[in-house]
Amino acid sequence: MKVKRWISLAIAGIIVELLGFALYNHARPFNILALANRFWNWISNNTSMNLGEQRATLYIGAALILLGMFIILFALSRLMQSVTTALTPGNTKDSLVDVIYRNRFLSQGVRVVVIGGGTGLSTMLRGLKQYTSNIVAVVTVTDDGGSSGKLLKQLNILPPGDIRNCLVALADSEATMTELFQYRFYGDGVGEGLRDHNFGNLLIAAMTGISGGDFEKAVQLTSKVLNIRGSVLPSTLQQVRLQGEMEDGSIIEGETNIVASPLKIKKIRLLPFDVEPPEEVKEAIELADIIVIGPGSVYTSIIPNLLVKGIPEALRKAKAKKVYICNVMTQPGETDGFSASDHLRAIQCHTSNRIIDYMIVNTASPSLEMLNKYRKTGSVLVEPDTDRIRNMGVRPIPGNYINQTDVVRHDAVLLAEAIMRLLL
C-alpha cells in the first residue's frame, strides 16, 4: 500500500512548512535565521540581486511555506489513493469518500441469513451484498462429487465446493482473485493428483490443515483473503451423507447417486441423523431481520440444511420473515414435473414446523428457443400455481425474476429488490 511512505513524506512537509513560518516570523529555530542571512548574503554578493538582508528570511520563509504545502498536498493525495485502492481493489474510480460512505452504509444494513447451496445460493448472495454486509450464508455440506468429493475422501475434510462459491459471490476483491479461486486444473499436462480440482477448494483444504483440522476457522481465514461482505458457515461441522428413499421404496446413499437415479425421490435423510449446527448458525437465525431459503436444488441443497437438528426449531422461533425462493426450471432427476407448490410441499414434508411465510415465484417465461433448449435436457418451466401456494398457508410473491443469457436463472438484482421490499 505504501502508506508509511506517504505519511512520512507528509510529516516532512509539515516540518518544512513550520521552518518556513519560523523564518517568515524572524524566529531562530536551531539558528536557522543566521544561516538564511548568510545564504542571502552569498546570493547578493555573487549575483546582481541586492534586496537587502532584512528581506532574506521573508523570501526564504515564504518559499519554504509553499514547498511544505506542496509536499503535504502531494503526500495526502497519494495516501488517499493508496487507501482507496486497498478498500476497493480493482476499482480505483471510486473516491475515498464514496468508499467510506458505501462501507458504512453496508455495515448498517439489515441482517440477512441465506440458507441453501449450489449456484442458486451464490446468485442470491451477489444481489444481497449490494444492500448489506450483514449477511450470513448457511451452506449445505453433502456434496460428494467432483473436486469436493475427492477432497472429502483424500483429506477427510468437509466438501468445500458450495462454500467456495458463496465466498466468491460475497467477495469484495479484484476480479483476478475471483478468477483464481474458480480456476480448475484440467488438460493432459495436469497430473492425476491435480486434475479436476479447483484452486479455491485446494486453498480451503490447505487452510484446514494450517488450522489444525478446524474447517470453520479455515473458512474464516479464506474469507479474509477474499475480503468478503458477510460470513459463510457450514450448516454442520460433522461429515454427513445424504440418503434417499425413492418412489419404489429403494434406498440410495450419496448425493451423486441419488441425483443420477431415474427414480423419483420420496424422502431425503441425513446420515447420521442427529448432527447439529455451529452455534453461530443458530445465533444468526435468532438475530436476523429476514431469512431467505434458496434458490437451489430442493432435495440436495435446500432440505439437507433443514434436516440438521436445531435449525428448523431456530427458524420457527425466529421473529424474522422467512422467504423461500422457488426455482425457475425443474431439475432432471430431482424435481421432474414439479410445480411451484410441489417444491413447497417437498420442504414442508421434511420439516415438522411451519418455517416459511413468503414464497417468491417467477411468472415470466423465457424465450421459446430457450425453452426448447432446456426441454431437450428434460427441464421445463416451473408452473407458478400461486393459488395452491396460498392455500398451503404461504403468501406467494409472483413476478419476473429471471435473467436470460445463455442459461435461464434468477436475476440477482431482481431477487434482492424483492427481498428488500419485504422489509419496508
Stretch-by-stretch model annotation:
Residues 1-91, 108, 142-262, 418-420:
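Electropositive, gly/pro-rich neighborhoods at or near active sites that engage anionic ligands
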Residues 2-7, 90, 337-424:
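C-terminal functional extensions of proteins
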Residues 94-108, 276-282:
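A short, basic/flexible loop-to-alpha-helix module at the beginning of a structural domain
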Residues 119-125, 147, 300-307:
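Short glycine/serine/threonine-rich phosphate/pyrophosphate-binding segments
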Residues 133, 318-322, 356, 394:
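A short helix->loop->beta-strand "cap" motif at the edges of active sites that frequently abuts
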Residues 142-148, 300, 322-324, 329-333, ...:
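Short gly/pro/ser/thr-enriched loop/turn and capping motifs at secondary-structure boundaries
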Residues 288:
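An anion/phosphate-binding loop that grips the pyrophosphate of nucleotide cofactors and donors
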Residues 305-312, 338-343:
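Charged helix-capping and loop-helix junction motifs
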